[in-house]
Amino acid sequence: MKEIKDFEKIRIKIASPDQIRSWSYGEVKKSETINYRTLRPEKDGLFCERIFGTTKEWECYCGKFKSIRYKGIICDRCNVEVTHFKVRRERMGHIELSAPVAHIWYYKYIPSRIGLLLDITASNLNSILYYEKYIVIEPGDTDLKKMQLLNEDEYSEAKERYGMSFSASMGAEAIKTLLENLDLDELSSKLRLQMIDKDDKTDKKLLRRLEIIENFKVSGNKPEWMIMDVLPVIPPEIRPMVQLDGGRFATSDLNDLYRRVINRNNRLRKLLLLNAPEIIVRNEKRMLQESVDSLFDNSHKRKVVKGTSNRPLKSLSDALKGKQGRFRQNLLGKRVDYSGRSVIVVGPELKLHQCGIPAKMALELFKPFVIRKLIESESVFNIKRAKSLIEQEVDEVWQILDNVIKEHPVLLNRAPTLHRLGIQAFEPVLVEGKAIKLHPLVCHAYNADFDGDQMAVHVPLTPAAQAESWALMLSTNNLLNPANGHPIVFPSQDIVLGLYYLTMERKNVVGEGRKFSNFNHVLLAINNKSLDYNARIYVKVDGEYIETTAGCVVFNEALPGKISFVNKTLSDYELQNLISEVYVVYGSSIVIEMLDIIKELGFKYATKFGCTISMSDIIVPEEKKVYVDKANREIAKIQNDYTKGVITGEERYNNVVSVWSKTNEELTNKMMEILKKDRDGFNVIYMMADSGARGSRNQIRQLAGMRGLMAKTSGDIIELPIISNFKEGLSVIEFFISTNGARKGLADTALKTADAGYLTRRLVDIAQDVVVRIEDCGTINGIKVEALKNGEEIVEPLREKAVGSYSIERIKSPITGEIILDVNEEITEDKIKLLETVGIDKLVIRSVLTCEAEHGVCQKCYGRDFSNNKPVNIGEAVGIIAAQSIGQPGTQLTMRTFHIGGVAQAGSEDDKIALKNSFILNGLEGFNVQVDGGLLFTRKGTLRVINVIYEEDIKDIKEFKVLDSQKVIKGMPLFTSKDGIDVLSSHIGYVRIKDNKLMIVSEEQEISLKTGTKLEVNVGDYVEAGRVIGTFDPFAEPIIAEVRGKVKFKDIILGTTLKEEINLETGNIEKRITDQVFESLDPRILIINDRGIEIASYVLPGDAYLQVEDGQDIDIGDIIAKLSKGSEKTQDITGGLPRVNDLFETRIPKNLTEMAKVSGVVQFKAIQKGKRLINVLDEYGVEHKHYIPAGKHLLVRDGDVVKAGDMLCDGRINPHDVLEILGGISLQEFLLAEIQDVYRKQGVSINDKHIGVIIKQMMKKVKIVSVGDTNFVYNQKVDKHTFYEQNKRVIEQGGEPAVASPILIGITKASLNIDSFISAASFQETTKVLTDASIAGSVDDLKGLKENVVIGHLIPTGTGMNLYKRVKVRENSSSEM
């Protein structure tokens, strides 16, 4: 027999009236429910036993037949079939409606589906359905038009005038007739022709109408089924009625809603029989329509039907919708039996794979197992007796429990489960008390602490579940974070402090300088108190004496034998690195052993250290006053400049904030220096921060330095800093300023948690069906990766980006020519080292972004699974892992929107350019002019530099072994020295011989320069490290004259485009261009020569401060006007979570930039409707128009040459523009870089492939640009694979394929547009999704995880994949062996 679960697809359609009647077991004719005396269902009522089945098992209503032997017999007295009472859960009834009624889902929801089919507006449709207007069905030979609406008077007039020669009616009957008369094929071809005529300007309505018509055609649904003649009644057990203690009844709201429908229906039937006046019948029909609407969707109506306690009744739609609806409450989230929860306490004595379960809890959880063992051991013979033994808690029960619990894993879960490590399996150990004991090292994965957190325990029951728990979920198998492959099980707090103390070195202690021949001697000396843990000693390791400390020896002695000697002071960072290295070299079993040893040692020596904090440990630097006085002097100078009118108010504010930030930073450095020297580095506060056990530099600064600048509630920074620290104590005003920040912090945290949770939910929804389904998709495309650099420092090395991926190309050594990496070979750590030694720093790798698997991704494109550092298994749910990896750190991201001027976090802005390395200036780009001994950049520019990695004087060289400009790698001979020794290169780079020096230099790098930068070096110069090569104003952007001449104002009119403000603080007059836009006025400054000819023109953006007068002589390099950075302060740089949200939802940013659509020459045109037209002429002379809001600060001038994708004005980039102008690959790179940037700033490491999985899902669809011979509709959005398949079919038949362009869809929209209607319906907008799916007759292939959970199947991933389900286990016969 086939099980009900053995189906592979599920389909949803509109039910026809015949279908509804075929489901039904009888008509519900009365609105009664239960007889109040007998408490039995009323005949023909909503709970009738004849229709829905008997309420008593194997017994009819009247009691004539009472026994299972009469099964299936229908009683001749009461007509009730003798069955099991459970049939009341599945038998349906129906109500025959006296007048047709429209289904609210199809007419009320926007866009109204019936309205689209008939081309009637929603409001008109409403007035027809609610019997307010007539609609002409057949105009006959009258002046009326088909589908014309008539009110009462017009209808009466037409009746008088034309008599019976036309037909018009109202209500659902009229709509039903119209729907029956529709010819879908004819309508479809008519609309397709209209679309071709309209071409580009297609309106959305046409597209929607066509889609709905096509859906009806394909699905086999008939449009008239949206109007109902018969109403299904759901089984009574699903809308139960129960008696409460007081004799009253509690009933489901649906019964009340059905009752209203039945009452009105019966009343209407009577009125029709009585031939009542039309107006009464019509009113009753309208009420019937309303009552059916309420039954289907009560919340969507204007006038909600309310129950007894004045609360809206819950209709069928409400039962599905939202968090409390059927999908999310009962199908996706269920409560589980065999589970318990309790408070957690730390269990330092546990092994990593163990957890402590309170004995009483374990007994309850494992009760069935204990009962079985009791019966097997013949202590008892039935379950009842076994239960009573367990309740008495006899000794035998505890013995049995001990045996049952051995090797039976339990799952521990801590809410919120943000990633998969929030549920792990442990072996239970029975403990006294009522609290669950948790191993201290797994706290990080759970984000647990012991301040009252609770955890839940679940018991896996079946052998398969236990096997999976052991093999996949055991805590010792989850040592790495799936987001990035770093260890997630590592010591923190006490353990770190203990080991830091143990491995530190202290001067002048017992036993300093002694030599020991082996570890045992060291331990003996420590035990005899003749050697201090922190003493510097010499000990023999592998036959050589090394300098170390006694504590290091103790640490290494305890480690497993294979690990090489660890000789450094261990901070938390060092410990994590150690764990990583040991994992890579020796595997997980050694790591697990090592972790438990580290835990024991850490706790032991933290106890021995016994550190305490006192006020004397908090040392305030004596120099503090000096720093503060210096800052006050600088601020006085800034104030003076402001009073003179040299700088604007915003610049003054920015400068003040900058001064305090710098002062605070300098003071903190001094303070840390003092703390480090205090007590030979054994200052407890410093030790805690330095070891990474607790506290940070920032917190110590507030204790012993100065609290610094605080932010207002608006996010602006209060320029009055808190100079005191907590040791000195705050003044009243300082305390009051502090309260702002504290309150904001708490409010942010609460909002952030909900926001991050919602982000995770949306990400899971879009990626839930991305599973590794095949081994190799065979693609030849990949993406380029290289180390991510910020100027000269490497932010993310190539290793992070490439390890674990597969190469697309064959890579040979540039020196020997041998193959280092072959096509489709995994890039391992060793391969990366090899590539680095030969100087290869760019790779093309396979990526999820370019994977061509039809569903999900393939093994080769995904690469390594970071949770175990092995190639990913087929069946791994990588989409969910990706969503969790991005969503889980979401709670750590800030909600705050940073201001450009906001420097509470940002530190001070520098006004100098100086590089950390020596370098050679290789070239300049950007418009610059020569002014007194330097170069002044009048627009943004770029420096091209090559860093000097190594240099040697030529006079010490006897013979060169390399040529100028030759590439060298590590270990290559460079020259022979005077002593005849060959000197080898210790770096990779290029040889440069210059100024009597032999240098090794890096590849060229670009450094961007701001407008107004003054450069003091020339191309070709060699510059030492740290030398200042240029200066600029960080708080203002100048507009600079590039020619000599006379100033002439154009369209700068006082009171219109120019505003003169008297600064009340300084009494100076400030001239500012207004940000109002005038059609005919375009404020600019012209520069004219002696002959009065215009030689330069500068457009002035809104809010620019003028620095020149009309008619004034001007020289090259003079500042004409400047834009204060403060005016940019209002343009928030959205950081943190809101930014990630915007990127994933592909929202168009507020302050938008305009990107050049093509490469070419810029031409300025006039301002029209508040927008400036800028044309870019491409190489063929074609003009491409760009409209930029007037008053925006332009980054180009008339006649400039731009590249496609260059920004023409300042602002934020729109991801959709990137896709349109630069294409899909650039968009992927842009989104990846922007999202990673937010996480990286918060110190969160997420591997690119996780974000790649989500971006891939956002770019799954394409938009049809040309239809060809396919069935697509112009502008329709379809799945890439559907598109390719249709085209393939059309090409095979010799037709013309369709053309489409890629589009980017935000995650919420993409989740709703997903192929699976079950998944989409359980996400958001449930009723809308189901409405559209039913019209289209959608089939859900049950490919994703969510739909299978809802249906109750095993999820198709991991061991639940069909691939693995079909595995048969056969015994080997002896002959084969």
Swiss-Prot record:
MF annotations from Gene Ontology: DNA binding; DNA-directed RNA polymerase activity; magnesium ion binding; zinc ion binding
Catalytic activity of the protein: RNA(n) + a ribonucleoside 5'-triphosphate = RNA(n+1) + diphosphate
CDD domains: RNAP_beta'_C (cd02655), RNAP_beta'_N (cd01609)
Top-level division of the source organism's lineage: Bacteria
EC number annotated for this UniProt entry: 2.7.7.6
Gene Ontology CC entries for this record: DNA-directed RNA polymerase complex
One example of a Gene Ontology biological process annotation: DNA-templated transcription
Keywords from the named record: DNA-directed RNA polymerase, Magnesium, Metal-binding, Nucleotidyltransferase, Transcription, Transferase, Zinc
Annotated Zn(2+) 1 binding sites: C60, C62, C75, C78
InterPro entries (UniProt xref): DNA-dir_RpoC_beta_prime (IPR045867), DNA-dir_RpoC_beta_prime_bact (IPR012754), RNA_pol_asu (IPR000722), RNA_pol_N (IPR006592), RNA_pol_Rpb1_1 (IPR007080), RNA_pol_Rpb1_3 (IPR007066), RNA_pol_Rpb1_3_sf (IPR042102), RNA_pol_Rpb1_4 (IPR007083)
Cofactor: how bound: Binds 1 Mg(2+) ion per subunit.
Binding-site residues for Mg(2+), renumbered to this chain: D449, D451, D453
A Pfam family matched in the record: RNA_pol_Rpb1_3
UniProt key word Repeat: no
Cofactor dependency: Mg(2+); Zn(2+)
Binding, Zn(2+) 2: C777, C851, C858, C861
PANTHER family noted in UniProt: DNA-DIRECTED RNA POLYMERASE, DNA-DIRECTED RNA POLYMERASE SUBUNIT BETA
Biological function: DNA-dependent RNA polymerase catalyzes the transcription of DNA into RNA using the four ribonucleoside triphosphates as substrates.
Assembly behavior: The RNAP catalytic core consists of 2 alpha, 1 beta, 1 beta' and 1 omega subunit. When a sigma factor is associated with the core the holoenzyme is formed, which can initiate transcription.
Family: Belongs to the RNA polymerase beta' chain family.
Protein name: DNA-directed RNA polymerase subunit beta'
Originating organism: Borrelia turicatae (strain 91E135)
